[in-house]
């Protein structure tokens, strides 16, 4: 099942990744881990095919240093990364994605969050393979309450998945899983992955 553990600091842990990879489930690892911790867990068997490092608005030099460090210390290559910020529409964000795509053409890139087809278009044109969709619908997300910005999750999934298909990409539904059936609804709306955990 294409489920991805959320990159929240109490969910996207190395321990979670080790447990989930046994079932071929992916894990967006929290961005609060240091390089040496990554090396330690990769050497313990953390599979980089299922466990993706998360970045925010880091400079390309930080991403380059991380990928090079992991390869040098573990003999394993980072296969996918997740870019995660609350507002995926800002210019600086799309610029970082473009720089990363240019530097690492074979790397899988998932970026977000957005809730509109225009946001999907922006991030996919910048080089993302997948786009995280969801603002304000997460179990502990207070974006809608504090900023007034948000969008119903199912509606966002439907609209954004249609746009992603135009670029041969996919969306990751991020948020809105609260009751029985929400995961199924996300897949029915066209999501390639459903991110869960809060």
Where do the PLM segments sit?
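Active-site entrance/lid segments in N-terminal catalytic domains of soluble metabolic enzymes
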Residues: 1-170, 198
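Active-site capping/gating regions of soluble enzymes
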Residues: 170-198
